[in-house]
């Protein structure tokens, strides 16, 4: 199980680069609902549509100022040791998909959801893209069951987690392939 990193200098440095890059290359307009972002100690699952691969979590991370989001990330990129070390240091965890064709994918995910539940219990923010993949589409694709599995694991771990919040986020790019100059 990946340990929780608190105040990791690499994350703080990368976050500053991400914020500078996102605001440099993308014009963010129409951000509504920030008043609904809860106290950083309230366990929260950030759930967003997934249009643009790596850019989606970077945009979200650059906007959430007061706490780190622990992302569920497709498992196949954790196979290389250096990449895995970096991802774990940024509090990312692998999520196994059906297309990974692992016979024990459900068991592995059950363990990951237990870790997510423990992190939520201590006030972390978890993030995932329930569509399970990304495409440049202007519509929501069918959702996978990850959010419900995470909520169930959390309530099973600690029934008092009724204050668990799900924060829905909609991302819509006007011009995905182009960058602002």
What residue spans do the PLM features occupy?
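Short, contiguous pre-domain boundary segments
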Residues: 1-3
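Soluble catalytic domains of membrane acyltransferases
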Residues: 6-181
């Amino acid at each position: 199980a990946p340990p929780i990193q608190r105040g990791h200098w690499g994350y703080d440095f990368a976050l500053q680069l991400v914020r500078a890059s996102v605001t440099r290359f993308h014009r963010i307009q129409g951000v509504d609902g920030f008043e609904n972002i809860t106290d950083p100690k309230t366990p929260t699952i950030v759930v967003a549509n997934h249009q643009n691969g790596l850019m989606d979590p970077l945009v979200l991370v650059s906007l959430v100022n007061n706490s780190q989001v622990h992302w569920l990330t497709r498992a196949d990129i954790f196979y290389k040791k250096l990449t895995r070390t970096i991802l774990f240091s940024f509090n990312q965890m692998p999520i196994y998909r059906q297309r990974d064709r692992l016979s024990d994918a459900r068991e592995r995910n059950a363990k990951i959801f237990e870790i997510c539940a423990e992190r939520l219990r201590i006030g972390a923010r978890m993030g995932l893209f329930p569509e399970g993949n990304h495409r440049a589409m202007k519509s929501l694709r069918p959702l996978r069951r990850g959010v419900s599995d995470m909520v169930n694991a959390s309530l099973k771990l600690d029934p008092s987690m009724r204050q668990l919040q799900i924060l829905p986020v909609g991302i819509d790019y006007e011009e995905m392939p182009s960058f602002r100059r």
